[in-house]
Amino acid sequence: MNMKKGVSQLTLQTLSLVAGFMAWSIISPLMPFISQDVDISPGQISVILAIPVILGSVLRVPFGYLTNIVGAKWVFFWSFIVLLLPIFLLGQAQSPGMLMLSGFFLGIGGAIFSVGVTSVPKYFSKDKVGLANGIYGVGNIGTAVSSFCAPVLAGAIGWQNTVRSYLIILSIFAILMFFLGDKNEPKVKIPLMAQVKDLSKNYKLYYLSLWYFITFGAFVAFGIFLPNFLVDHFSIDKVDAGIRSGIFIALATFLRPVGGVIGDKFNAVQALIIDFVIMIIGALILSLSSHIVLFTIGCLAISICAGIGNGLIFKLVPSYFSKEAGSANGIVSMMGGLGGFFPPLVITFVTSITGSSHLAFFFLAIFGVIALITMIHLNKKEKAIRI
């Protein structure tokens, strides 16, 4: 394996993921500004914030498969080119419908996650895959970049011009990928239906999908709803809410490689069991508290566990599915993305019915317990095989 090429492609793809996630998440931190100019109901806000997750999740399966066919270079390149259109439309949006339309196609920025997790392991030995995928996952920091920077820029130049500035960023990365992407990336051309048939018989795929539905889903969902939630429920300043949301995202992002390293050195399933116990405790804190201090503690616990859990899970995916890595990565990451779609809608619905969001966070704890049971089951089966 060419380590020099591996490092260069890992760097390029990680930075490309940053750009993609910046575009994918641009609406959420700007929503407090957008809602001042566009007449939007609370229900419409929830839908608009959740919509980018749909395409960002569903496209992860074909993107992972295409990466094995044509290589990461071309999937990244054309994704950035296509993303220019919804960014342009968002900068012109004057109605909820236009916000929804542009947000839907911004999902492409989230779908490119499966490109790197399929491509990067090809350049590294098995004992380095967890770390490499963890480093690539740091590209999730693009969400935090938007959370930190977009509100500040919007306050200075307006939210429309802030959105338009992303056209420059995406154009730069399209050019970089065109000239620096690896055109000789190893290809894997196993027929898609053959991969799906084999994967559908493996219960581990369903377990990993459930776990990632929770960990990455929490990462995405909290990043989506926190800015508006903090403003509405705790009367926090819009810029301060963006910074707090950015801290949540940054913490989870930078801990992702830590999860990968833990998975490389120790039993990843056992580490996930510990991780989920702490996450369940964090969810229970959120479900039982209304004070900003306790809410912050619960959010930090969720952030830490989501980040480490994401890294651990994507250590396991290439280990369990080496021949079907592209499709498996796509399916698992798709489920993670979908995990971020439902919580904002559930929180809005529960709050409208009960007057409080507590029950919604309790649902997260319940899902965590279900996942914990499956982890214990898998750990017992693997122990029996080792014996």
UniProtKB/Swiss-Prot annotation:
PROSITE patterns per UniProt: MFS
A GO cellular component annotation in the UniProt record: plasma membrane
Keywords, alphabetical: Cell membrane, Membrane, Nitrate assimilation, Transmembrane, Transmembrane helix, Transport
Keyword Chaperone among record annotations: no
Expression induction or repression: Positively regulated by the two-component system NreB/NreC.
Topology with respect to the bilayer: Multi-pass membrane protein
Subcellular location: Cell membrane
Gene3D superfamilies on file: MFS general substrate transporter like domains
Listed CDD domains: MFS_NRT2_like
Taxonomic superkingdom: Bacteria
PANTHER family, sorted: HIGH-AFFINITY NITRATE TRANSPORTER 2.3
Descriptive protein name: Probable nitrate transporter NarT
